[in-house]
Amino acid sequence: MTSTADVFDKKDQFNFVFPFTAIVGQEEMKISLLLNVVDPKIGGVMIMGDRGTGKTTTIRALVDILPDILVVKDDPYNSHPHDVDLMSSEVQALVLNRMNIETCYTKVPLVDLPLGATEDRVCGSIDIEKALSEGKKSFEPGLLAKANRGLLYVDEINLLDDHLVDVLLDCSASGWNLVEREGISVKHPSKFVLIGSGNPEEGELRPQLLDRFGLHAEIKTVKDPELRVKIVEERTEFDKDPVAYIRKFSKSQDELREKIINAQNLLPKVEMPRELKFNISKICGILDIDGLRGDIVTNRASKAYAAIQQRNVVEIGDIQKVIVSCLRHRLRKDPLEIIESGEKIQKAFTNIF
């Protein structure tokens, strides 16, 4: 496992990243990201907020606190050497034939999806001419292949083509990418945490797409002058000497990484009392939330938060910490309503609990 102190020994690390534990404020965004890392089944996170509030900085910082993953060496899909659901068909064939597989540890991939990306760039492309002339499937993996077992980040996702957003959400939910062209199909694992960010002034996602994101974090510009000055000072110190600044936070970074590993291991043992499950569903009913995604995600996020706190039983406080992010984007829009969505959810929570 890579520790923060090791990064200075690697040549590819000289593009320094601001430490996650040094980021001031924006707790809702940080917690939403950590919950998805502990339990990727939560279904990703949509981060909406003003420009210059640290959305991209925080997402890039997340990778440095994640434990390294074991992969098959030189495999374009980051295949797991033992888990069949995370293997490409080529690696599966090697395993079935009991061939030796060379493995190595690598950092969790963070793949950026540019707004102008074509479907072939995202999903991968099949060389039809080669397939017809030589009878071989020639597949060029896309961004979804690179993102397997990692994070896929789309900045300004609200401006991305709806069809591509649909493709990303389908892959994120199923863990597989299926490419079909002219009767030829290729399937490969693509299990990732989808992270979208955007500015609400530039438009929202369609409600049907928004509902499929597990969590929704709202980021606002810090108003407190003390905090604003602190943020400016921290950034100035980092820019002046990034090596010294990263070393300063190496202990807290390593501690958080250890906390994530422990939470991932504890998660399968975390239980939620039936009474709390019932109350979550009651809140979703009172708020008139369509479908059951809200119930499911709130249950999962509450368990993940309890695991981060190193507890194997969910408490009321765990639910309160995550419920706004789980339900905010699932509320029906009422243009005449004055109360903010977060306040409405907290009010319903207080009435039930």
Swiss-Prot record:
One of its GO terms (molecular function) is magnesium chelatase activity. One of its GO terms (biological process) is photosynthesis. ATP binds at G49, D50, R51, G52, T53, G54, K55, T56. Pathway: Porphyrin-containing compound metabolism; chlorophyll biosynthesis. The keyword Ribosomal protein does not apply. GO terms for cellular component: chloroplast. The keyword Glycosyltransferase does not apply. It comes from the Eukaryota. It is an enzyme of class 6 (ligase). InterPro entries: AAA+_ATPase (IPR003593), CHLI-like (IPR045006), ChlI/MoxR_AAA_lid (IPR041628), Mg_chelatase_ATPase-isu (IPR011775), Mg_chelatse_chII-like_cat_dom (IPR000523), P-loop_NTPase (IPR027417). Its EC number is 6.6.1.1. Its main location: plastid. Keywords: ATP-binding, Chlorophyll biosynthesis, Chloroplast, Ligase, Nucleotide-binding, Photosynthesis, Plastid. It is found in: Plastid, Chloroplast. It catalyses: protoporphyrin IX + Mg(2+) + ATP + H2O = Mg-protoporphyrin IX + ADP + phosphate + 3 H(+). PANTHER family: MAGNESIUM-CHELATASE SUBUNIT CHLI, MAGNESIUM-CHELATASE SUBUNIT CHLI-2, CHLOROPLASTIC. Belongs to the Mg-chelatase subunits D/I family. Involved in chlorophyll biosynthesis; introduces a magnesium ion into protoporphyrin IX to yield Mg-protoporphyrin IX. This is Magnesium-chelatase subunit ChlI. It comes from Cyanidium caldarium. The lineage of its organism: Eukaryota, Rhodophyta, Bangiophyceae, Cyanidiales, Cyanidiaceae.
